[in-house]
Amino acid sequence: MGEKLPVVYKRFICSFPDCNATYNKNRKLQAHLCKHTGERPFPCTYEGCEKGFVTLHHLNRHVLSHTGEKPCKCETENCNLAFTTASNMRLHFKRAHSSPAQVYVCYFADCGQQFRKHNQLKIHQYIHTNQQPFKCSHEGCDKCYASPSRLKRHEKTHAGYPCRKDSTCPFVGKTWSDYMKHAAELHSEVTCSICNRTFKRKSFLKEHKKIHREERIVYRCPRENCDRTYTTKFNLKSHILTFHENLRPFVCEHEGCGKTFAMKQSLDRHFNTHDPEKKKMVKPPRPVRSLASRLSGYKPKKSKKKKKPSQTPAMESQEQQPDASKADPLPVLENLTLK
């Protein structure tokens, strides 16, 4: 008789109530606990990326999406494909280079769908039998689903999305959109480490930091006999419209003001001088889109604004003259070194 294999005891037990998960390694338990706490102890350090992960392995795999590296190369002759993980490479080899894979066919009448895994076939067949064996475990909820993925998506409505920006913040969003809205409104302010200016978004701070570089890209005005240079395309466009095209179509309607501007953003920023307590510019609400619409990649066309019946003289002059920002290219001229 052969020797008995040693029994592996799962001695790492989840301490959360109503959770019976057990593991044979502590690191697996620690990763599991993050599902209860919402923690992501391994954050991505790339600028502008706010993603976090429950394991170092998942973080290292994510970093490859920033670097573009694909260290796992297919060793099959005449195949030059490479992958970010060994598991993806093995899956590719199995599908593309091994003998024809076994397929599982649905035997229900007029169906015949094929699946690579028996479990996929089994879940698919629940559609034909009208079974919903995956039940929500949340107390007081009796909803059932035909697949684990649909159940998992539903359970998020109970668990929610806890705020990870501040450990003392008690906010829990019912949906990911609620969480993102909360984070943008209350936790998105970032500070420049050089001049202490604050910004609502990391992208704004990233653009601002360019002014502190010893070497920066500058844009020269393309108009003849004009040597003005600017550090942003926005300022160059504003210069062309204001000084070369004499276009200042955006008029401040505040009583006793009447200042005009070449760019709408400049007018919006100017409004704050009349209302110093205004924290931020109000953006028009965006139309609500379903999750399926966003995942499909479809981008709805922007609706054209209706022309107002009354216009200021400055607005009328804009319609009669060409758009200088479209007519002139805005080339990068040189790297300016500050001494």
UniProtKB/Swiss-Prot annotation:
Chain intervals with Basic residues compositional bias: 299-309
Annotated Gene Ontology cellular component terms: nucleus
UniProt keyword list: DNA-binding, Metal-binding, Nucleus, Repeat, Ribosome biogenesis, RNA-binding, Transcription, Transcription regulation, Zinc, Zinc-finger
First-listed, main subcellular location of the protein, grouped into a coarse class: nucleus
UniProt-listed InterPro entries: TFIIIA_Zfn-C2H2 (IPR054599), Zinc_finger_trans_reg (IPR051061), Znf_C2H2_sf (IPR036236), Znf_C2H2_type (IPR013087)
Zn finger residue spans: C2H2-type: 12-36, 42-66, 72-97, 104-128, 134-158, 161-187, 190-212, 219-244, 250-274
Residue ranges, annotated region (Disordered): 271-339
Recorded superkingdom: Eukaryota
Annotated Pfam families: TFIIIA_zf-C2H2, zf-C2H2
A GO biological process held by the record: ribosomal large subunit biogenesis
Signal peptide: none
Polar residues bias spans: 311-323
GO molecular function, one term: RNA binding
Subcellular localization, as worded in the UniProt entry: Nucleus
PANTHER family in the record: TRANSCRIPTION FACTOR IIIA (PTHR46179:SF1), ZINC FINGER PROTEIN (PTHR46179)
Function: Involved in ribosomal large subunit biogenesis. Interacts with the internal control region (ICR) of approximately 50 bases within the 5S RNA genes, is required for correct transcription of these genes by RNA polymerase III. Also binds the transcribed 5S RNA's.
Name assigned to this protein: Transcription factor IIIA
The organism of origin for this protein: Anaxyrus americanus
Gene name per UniProt: gtf3a
